[in-house]
Protein backbone atom coordinates (compact mmCIF):
# COMPACT_ATOMS: atom_id res chain seq x y z
CA UNK A 1 0.00 0.00 0.00
CA UNK A 2 1.49 3.31 -1.05
CA UNK A 3 1.96 6.15 1.39
CA UNK A 4 -0.47 8.99 0.60
CA UNK A 5 0.93 12.48 0.11
CA UNK A 6 -1.04 15.59 1.03
CA UNK A 7 -0.25 18.63 -1.10
CA UNK A 8 0.03 22.22 0.09
CA UNK A 9 2.01 23.63 -2.79
CA UNK A 10 3.69 27.01 -2.83
CA UNK A 11 1.98 29.64 -4.97
CA UNK A 12 3.40 30.05 -8.47
CA UNK A 13 3.80 33.72 -7.58
CA UNK A 14 6.60 32.64 -5.20
CA UNK A 15 8.41 30.32 -7.62
CA UNK A 16 11.10 32.95 -8.22
CA UNK A 17 11.91 32.89 -4.50
CA UNK A 18 11.34 29.27 -3.53
CA UNK A 19 11.86 27.11 -6.63
CA UNK A 20 12.98 29.19 -9.63
CA UNK A 21 14.46 26.42 -11.76
CA UNK A 22 13.02 23.46 -13.62
CA UNK A 23 14.40 20.20 -12.23
CA UNK A 24 14.86 16.61 -13.32
CA UNK A 25 15.80 15.04 -10.00
CA UNK A 26 18.70 12.62 -9.64
CA UNK A 27 18.91 12.31 -5.85
CA UNK A 28 16.91 12.37 -2.62
CA UNK A 29 18.33 14.38 0.29
CA UNK A 30 17.35 13.70 3.90
CA UNK A 31 17.17 16.43 6.55
CA UNK A 32 16.13 16.81 10.20
CA UNK A 33 14.04 19.91 10.89
CA UNK A 34 15.85 20.79 14.16
CA UNK A 35 12.52 21.83 15.70
CA UNK A 36 9.37 20.13 16.99
CA UNK A 37 6.80 21.39 14.48
CA UNK A 38 4.44 19.05 12.63
CA UNK A 39 4.72 18.40 8.90
CA UNK A 40 1.71 20.63 8.24
CA UNK A 41 3.27 23.49 10.17
CA UNK A 42 6.66 22.99 8.50
CA UNK A 43 5.18 23.25 5.03
CA UNK A 44 2.87 26.14 5.90
CA UNK A 45 5.78 28.10 7.34
CA UNK A 46 8.05 27.30 4.40
CA UNK A 47 5.62 28.36 1.70
CA UNK A 48 4.43 31.42 3.63
CA UNK A 49 7.66 33.11 4.69
CA UNK A 50 9.97 35.40 2.72
CA UNK A 51 13.11 33.27 3.00
CA UNK A 52 14.34 31.42 -0.07
CA UNK A 53 14.90 28.23 1.96
CA UNK A 54 12.64 25.51 0.63
CA UNK A 55 12.13 21.75 0.42
CA UNK A 56 9.77 19.34 -1.26
CA UNK A 57 8.37 17.18 1.57
CA UNK A 58 7.93 17.23 5.34
CA UNK A 59 7.25 13.96 7.18
CA UNK A 60 5.98 13.62 10.73
CA UNK A 61 4.61 10.71 12.74
CA UNK A 62 1.25 10.83 10.96
CA UNK A 63 1.62 12.06 7.39
CA UNK A 64 3.68 13.25 4.44
CA UNK A 65 3.01 16.74 3.09
CA UNK A 66 4.39 18.17 -0.15
CA UNK A 67 5.19 21.87 -0.49
CA UNK A 68 6.96 22.12 -3.86
CA UNK A 69 6.36 20.47 -7.25
CA UNK A 70 8.88 17.74 -8.01
CA UNK A 71 9.74 19.35 -11.34
CA UNK A 72 11.06 22.47 -9.56
CA UNK A 73 14.28 22.79 -7.58
CA UNK A 74 14.49 23.65 -3.89
CA UNK A 75 17.04 25.62 -1.87
CA UNK A 76 17.80 23.09 0.84
CA UNK A 77 21.38 21.81 0.66
CA UNK A 78 23.59 24.89 0.87
CA UNK A 79 25.82 23.97 -2.08
CA UNK A 80 25.16 27.10 -4.10
CA UNK A 81 22.99 28.28 -6.95
CA UNK A 82 24.15 25.57 -9.32
CA UNK A 83 25.11 22.85 -6.84
CA UNK A 84 23.68 19.38 -7.56
CA UNK A 85 22.07 19.19 -4.12
CA UNK A 86 20.04 22.34 -4.69
CA UNK A 87 19.44 21.76 -8.38
CA UNK A 88 19.00 18.01 -8.70
CA UNK A 89 17.77 16.57 -5.40
CA UNK A 90 14.39 16.08 -3.75
CA UNK A 91 14.40 17.46 -0.21
CA UNK A 92 12.75 15.41 2.57
CA UNK A 93 12.53 16.93 6.06
CA UNK A 94 11.94 14.62 9.06
CA UNK A 95 10.00 16.40 11.80
CA UNK A 96 10.25 16.46 15.62
CA UNK A 97 14.03 16.03 15.59
CA UNK A 98 14.78 18.67 18.25
CA UNK A 99 13.37 16.69 21.18
CA UNK A 100 13.38 13.22 19.65
CA UNK A 101 11.41 10.53 21.45
CA UNK A 102 8.54 8.37 20.17
CA UNK A 103 7.10 11.02 17.83
CA UNK A 104 10.43 11.54 16.12
CA UNK A 105 11.05 7.79 15.92
CA UNK A 106 7.66 7.34 14.24
CA UNK A 107 8.40 10.24 11.87
CA UNK A 108 11.75 8.74 10.94
CA UNK A 109 10.16 5.33 10.34
CA UNK A 110 7.54 6.88 8.05
CA UNK A 111 10.25 8.86 6.24
CA UNK A 112 12.25 5.69 5.67
CA UNK A 113 9.23 4.03 4.07
CA UNK A 114 8.44 7.15 2.06
CA UNK A 115 11.97 7.55 0.70
CA UNK A 116 11.91 3.88 -0.30
CA UNK A 117 8.63 4.59 -2.09
CA UNK A 118 10.18 7.53 -3.97
CA UNK A 119 13.08 5.29 -5.00
CA UNK A 120 10.75 2.55 -6.21
CA UNK A 121 8.66 4.99 -8.22
CA UNK A 122 11.77 6.14 -10.07
CA UNK A 123 13.52 2.80 -10.42
CA UNK A 124 16.40 4.11 -8.31
CA UNK A 125 18.68 2.31 -5.88
CA UNK A 126 19.98 3.35 -2.46
CA UNK A 127 22.93 5.08 -4.15
CA UNK A 128 20.56 7.98 -4.93
CA UNK A 129 20.04 8.81 -1.23
CA UNK A 130 22.11 11.59 0.33
CA UNK A 131 22.21 13.47 3.62
CA UNK A 132 22.36 17.28 3.75
CA UNK A 133 25.90 17.03 5.08
CA UNK A 134 27.08 15.37 1.86
CA UNK A 135 26.41 18.51 -0.17
CA UNK A 136 27.71 21.34 2.00
CA UNK A 137 29.12 19.90 5.21
CA UNK A 138 26.24 21.12 7.40
CA UNK A 139 25.61 18.86 10.40
CA UNK A 140 22.26 17.66 9.13
CA UNK A 141 20.27 15.44 9.64
CA UNK A 142 21.51 16.39 13.11
CA UNK A 143 19.75 13.75 15.22
CA UNK A 144 20.64 10.88 12.92
CA UNK A 145 24.26 12.05 12.81
CA UNK A 146 24.59 12.70 16.55
CA UNK A 147 23.29 9.20 17.27
CA UNK A 148 25.67 7.69 14.72
CA UNK A 149 22.85 6.15 12.73
CA UNK A 150 23.23 7.35 9.14
CA UNK A 151 24.40 3.94 7.92
CA UNK A 152 21.53 2.36 9.82
CA UNK A 153 18.95 4.67 8.25
CA UNK A 154 20.29 3.99 4.76
CA UNK A 155 20.27 0.27 5.47
CA UNK A 156 16.64 0.50 6.64
CA UNK A 157 15.67 2.35 3.45
CA UNK A 158 17.46 -0.26 1.36
CA UNK A 159 15.79 -3.12 3.23
CA UNK A 160 12.40 -1.49 2.68
CA UNK A 161 13.20 -1.00 -0.99
CA UNK A 162 14.49 -4.51 -1.54
CA UNK A 163 11.92 -6.12 0.72
CA UNK A 164 9.07 -4.82 -1.39
CA UNK A 165 10.68 -6.21 -4.51
CA UNK A 166 11.45 -9.54 -2.88
CA UNK A 167 8.01 -10.05 -1.39
CA UNK A 168 6.02 -9.15 -4.47
CA UNK A 169 8.19 -9.87 -7.46
CA UNK A 170 10.90 -12.44 -6.81
CA UNK A 171 9.19 -15.53 -8.17
CA UNK A 172 12.21 -17.80 -8.05
CA UNK A 173 13.30 -20.46 -5.56
CA UNK A 174 16.50 -20.37 -3.56
CA UNK A 175 18.09 -22.74 -6.06
CA UNK A 176 16.99 -20.83 -9.17
CA UNK A 177 19.58 -19.45 -11.59
CA UNK A 178 17.40 -17.08 -13.62
CA UNK A 179 14.66 -14.51 -13.12
CA UNK A 180 11.83 -13.41 -15.44
CA UNK A 181 11.30 -9.65 -15.44
CA UNK A 182 7.84 -8.49 -14.35
CA UNK A 183 6.05 -5.16 -14.61
CA UNK A 184 7.66 -2.60 -12.32
CA UNK A 185 10.94 -4.47 -11.91
CA UNK A 186 14.27 -2.65 -12.02
CA UNK A 187 17.67 -4.22 -12.46
CA UNK A 188 18.85 -2.71 -9.17
CA UNK A 189 15.85 -4.23 -7.37
CA UNK A 190 16.43 -7.66 -8.93
CA UNK A 191 20.12 -7.48 -8.04
CA UNK A 192 19.48 -6.51 -4.43
CA UNK A 193 16.80 -9.16 -3.84
CA UNK A 194 19.15 -11.89 -5.06
CA UNK A 195 22.33 -10.75 -3.36
CA UNK A 196 24.07 -9.66 -6.55
CA UNK A 197 25.41 -6.36 -7.85
CA UNK A 198 23.95 -4.47 -10.80
CA UNK A 199 27.34 -4.61 -12.54
CA UNK A 200 27.44 -8.40 -12.18
CA UNK A 201 23.98 -8.78 -13.71
CA UNK A 202 24.92 -6.41 -16.52
CA UNK A 203 28.04 -8.42 -17.25
CA UNK A 204 26.55 -11.92 -17.31
CA UNK A 205 23.45 -10.75 -19.20
CA UNK A 206 25.24 -8.40 -21.63
CA UNK A 207 23.06 -5.47 -20.55
CA UNK A 208 24.48 -2.13 -21.69
CA UNK A 209 21.94 0.18 -20.05
CA UNK A 210 20.76 -0.98 -16.58
CA UNK A 211 17.73 1.33 -16.84
CA UNK A 212 16.31 -0.57 -19.81
CA UNK A 213 15.02 -4.07 -19.16
CA UNK A 214 11.83 -5.54 -20.65
CA UNK A 215 8.90 -7.40 -19.16
CA UNK A 216 9.45 -11.11 -19.76
CA UNK A 217 13.20 -10.72 -20.21
CA UNK A 218 15.18 -13.57 -18.66
CA UNK A 219 17.89 -12.39 -16.28
CA UNK A 220 20.61 -14.91 -15.48
CA UNK A 221 21.66 -14.93 -11.83
CA UNK A 222 25.08 -15.73 -10.36
CA UNK A 223 25.16 -19.29 -9.03
CA UNK A 224 25.60 -18.22 -5.40
CA UNK A 225 23.41 -15.12 -5.41
CA UNK A 226 20.00 -16.63 -4.73
CA UNK A 227 21.29 -18.51 -1.69
CA UNK A 228 22.96 -15.49 -0.10
CA UNK A 229 20.05 -14.38 2.05
CA UNK A 230 19.60 -17.76 3.76
CA UNK A 231 23.35 -17.93 4.26
CA UNK A 232 23.34 -14.49 5.87
CA UNK A 233 20.54 -15.48 8.25
CA UNK A 234 22.31 -18.69 9.26
CA UNK A 235 25.47 -16.68 9.95
CA UNK A 236 23.68 -14.78 12.73
CA UNK A 237 21.83 -17.27 14.97
CA UNK A 238 19.45 -15.61 17.40
CA UNK A 239 18.31 -16.88 20.81
CA UNK A 240 14.75 -17.62 21.84
CA UNK A 241 13.05 -16.06 24.84
CA UNK A 242 12.98 -12.53 26.21
CA UNK A 243 16.00 -10.39 27.09
CA UNK A 244 15.74 -6.97 28.71
CA UNK A 245 17.64 -4.66 31.01
CA UNK A 246 17.72 -6.21 34.49
CA UNK A 247 19.59 -5.71 37.75
CA UNK A 248 22.15 -7.18 37.67
CA UNK A 249 22.52 -6.91 33.88
CA UNK A 250 21.94 -10.04 31.79
CA UNK A 251 25.17 -11.31 30.27
CA UNK A 252 26.36 -14.16 28.09
CA UNK A 253 26.35 -15.79 24.68
CA UNK A 254 22.68 -15.10 23.97
CA UNK A 255 23.17 -11.39 24.49
CA UNK A 256 26.24 -11.39 22.25
CA UNK A 257 24.22 -13.14 19.51
CA UNK A 258 21.61 -10.38 19.65
CA UNK A 259 24.28 -7.67 19.62
CA UNK A 260 26.15 -9.26 16.71
CA UNK A 261 22.96 -9.45 14.63
CA UNK A 262 22.09 -5.85 15.48
CA UNK A 263 25.53 -4.70 14.35
CA UNK A 264 25.12 -6.67 11.10
CA UNK A 265 21.93 -4.68 10.50
CA UNK A 266 23.78 -1.39 11.30
CA UNK A 267 22.05 -0.93 14.67
CA UNK A 268 25.24 -0.75 16.71
CA UNK A 269 24.95 -1.00 20.52
CA UNK A 270 27.83 1.50 20.77
CA UNK A 271 29.44 2.37 17.44
CA UNK A 272 32.37 4.21 18.99
CA UNK A 273 33.31 1.42 21.39
CA UNK A 274 35.42 -1.69 20.87
CA UNK A 275 33.62 -4.18 18.58
CA UNK A 276 30.83 -1.57 18.19
CA UNK A 277 29.66 -2.38 21.72
CA UNK A 278 29.27 -6.13 21.16
CA UNK A 279 30.31 -7.17 24.67
CA UNK A 280 27.74 -9.75 25.78
CA UNK A 281 26.09 -7.39 28.28
CA UNK A 282 22.44 -6.34 27.81
CA UNK A 283 22.68 -2.81 29.15
CA UNK A 284 20.96 0.48 28.25
CA UNK A 285 22.95 0.93 25.02
CA UNK A 286 22.00 -2.51 23.72
CA UNK A 287 18.38 -1.89 24.72
CA UNK A 288 18.56 1.40 22.82
CA UNK A 289 19.87 -0.39 19.72
CA UNK A 290 16.97 -2.86 19.97
CA UNK A 291 14.55 0.04 20.42
CA UNK A 292 15.92 1.81 17.34
CA UNK A 293 15.58 -1.36 15.31
CA UNK A 294 12.02 -1.85 16.54
CA UNK A 295 11.06 1.74 15.75
CA UNK A 296 11.91 1.39 12.05
CA UNK A 297 10.50 -2.14 11.79
CA UNK A 298 6.88 -1.57 12.77
CA UNK A 299 7.31 -3.06 16.25
CA UNK A 300 6.59 -1.69 19.71
CA UNK A 301 9.74 0.26 20.51
CA UNK A 302 10.35 -0.87 24.09
CA UNK A 303 13.97 -2.04 23.89
CA UNK A 304 13.02 -5.56 24.94
CA UNK A 305 14.25 -8.43 22.75
CA UNK A 306 11.55 -11.07 22.28
CA UNK A 307 9.92 -13.38 19.70
CA UNK A 308 8.58 -10.59 17.46
CA UNK A 309 11.89 -8.74 17.43
CA UNK A 310 13.73 -11.99 16.75
CA UNK A 311 11.44 -12.79 13.79
CA UNK A 312 11.85 -9.31 12.32
CA UNK A 313 15.64 -9.43 12.70
CA UNK A 314 15.77 -12.84 10.99
CA UNK A 315 13.64 -11.44 8.18
CA UNK A 316 16.03 -8.55 7.61
CA UNK A 317 19.33 -10.43 7.94
From Swiss-Prot:
User: Which GO cellular component terms, listed alphabetically, does the Swiss-Prot or TrEMBL entry include?
Assistant: extracellular region
Q: Which Pfam families match?
A: Amidase_2, LysM, PG_binding_1
Q: Which GO terms describe its biological process?
A: cell wall organization; establishment of competence for transformation; peptidoglycan catabolic process; peptidoglycan turnover; sporulation resulting in formation of a cellular spore
Segments crossing the lipid bilayer: none
Per UniProt, residues of the LysM domain are: 177-221
Name the encoding gene, please.
Answer: xlyB
Q: Which family does it belong to?
A: Belongs to the N-acetylmuramoyl-L-alanine amidase 2 family.
The answer on whether this UniProt entry bears the keyword Secreted reads: yes
- Domain N-acetylmuramoyl-L-alanine amidase, by residue range, is 40-142
Identify the InterPro entries for this entry.
Amidase/PGRP_sf, Amidase_domain, LysM_dom, LysM_dom_sf, NAMLAA_amidase_2, Peptidoglycan-bd-like, PGBD-like_sf, PGBDSf
Catalyzes what? Hydrolyzes the link between N-acetylmuramoyl residues and L-amino acid residues in certain cell-wall glycopeptides
Enzyme category, top tier: hydrolase
- Tell me which Gene3D superfamilies the record gives: LysM domain, Peptidoglycan recognition protein-like, PGBD-like superfamily/PGBD
Supply the SUPFAM superfamilies for this chain. LysM domain, N-acetylmuramoyl-L-alanine amidase-like, PGBD-like
* Annotated keywords: Cell wall biogenesis/degradation, Competence, Hydrolase, Secreted, Signal, Sporulation
Query: What is the protein's name according to its record?
Result: N-acetylmuramoyl-L-alanine amidase XlyB
Amino acid sequence: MSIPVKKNLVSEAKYALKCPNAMSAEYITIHNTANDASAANEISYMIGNTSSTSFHFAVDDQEVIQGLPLNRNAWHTGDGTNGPGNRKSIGVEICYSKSGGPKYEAAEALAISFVAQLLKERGWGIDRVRKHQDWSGKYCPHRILSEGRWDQVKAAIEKELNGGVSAKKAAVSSSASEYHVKKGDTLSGIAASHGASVKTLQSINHITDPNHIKIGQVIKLPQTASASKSHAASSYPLPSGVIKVTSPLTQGTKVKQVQTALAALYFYPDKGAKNHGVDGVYGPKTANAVKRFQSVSGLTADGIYGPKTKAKMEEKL
